[in-house]
């Protein structure tokens, strides 16, 4: 890259860690506040954490001062999934068998693929023959394009009022919001806890609900 573009210096960094560098440059219309922030002056100084579910589950931390930004990359999305309900425990056991793994990370549940996994689990335990999504699951076995769009289809059907898809989406969101709460306690990020990723705008109303 350095030679091809004739740059003086090239530095490669984690794709999620780079988001920390962008925080000080955000304008007020580029983010929404979910809870009253501790940064009353909007100077963005302090310790920050970013979490985002999308293709995977990304996490990054950083310290922003008046003169410098220190970025602390993380692979926290690979922390082991800790079920908080019987339903989540059953999901975890199913994922172990379905994926043939001993350890289930949060990313297996809280991501686009994770949402699809929850749907597959639901359909494996319930006799639902005529639901349109079941046919979509079958088609996904033969098409990577359809497979990649499973999460989007779930959200679409849930938005259209499908009760089963809404239930699946709610289980996913409950796991995600619980993880975010744990992250806030773990990191004590008084500068700000930021929710990023492709799923954040789609679930904004859920994030601000009681």
Question: Language-model segments: what does each one mean?
Answer:
Residues 2-112, 116-117:
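Phosphate-binding/catalytic loop of phosphoryl-transfer enzymes
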Residues 90-210:
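ATP-binding/phosphotransfer module of carbohydrate and carboxylate kinases, centering on a glycine-rich
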């Amino acid at each position: 890259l350095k030679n091809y573009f004739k740059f003086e210096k090239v530095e490669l960094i984690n794709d999620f860690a780079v988001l920390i560098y962008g925080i000080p440059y955000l304008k007020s219309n580029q983010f929404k506040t979910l809870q009253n922030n501790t940064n009353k002056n909007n100077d963005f100084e302090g310790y920050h954490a970013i979490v985002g579910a999308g293709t995977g589950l990304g996490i990054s931390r950083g310290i922003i001062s008046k003169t410098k930004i220190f970025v602390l990359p993380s692979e926290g999305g690979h922390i082991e999934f800790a079920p908080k309900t019987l339903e989540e425990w059953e999901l975890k056991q199913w994922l172990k068998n379905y994926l043939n793994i001993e350890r289930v990370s949060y990313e297996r549940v809280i991501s686009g693929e994770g949402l699809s996994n929850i749907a597959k689990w639901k359909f494996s335990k319930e006799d639902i023959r005529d639901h349109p999504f079941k046919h979509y699951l079958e088609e996904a076995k033969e098409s990577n394009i359809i497979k990649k769009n499973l999460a989007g289809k779930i959200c679409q059907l849930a938005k259209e009022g499908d009760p089963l898809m809404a239930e699946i989406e709610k289980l996913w969101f409950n796991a995600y919001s619980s993880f975010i709460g744990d992250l806030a306690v773990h990191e004590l990020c008084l500068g700000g806890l930021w929710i990023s990723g492709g799923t954040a705008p789609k679930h904004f109303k859920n994030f601000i609900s009681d």
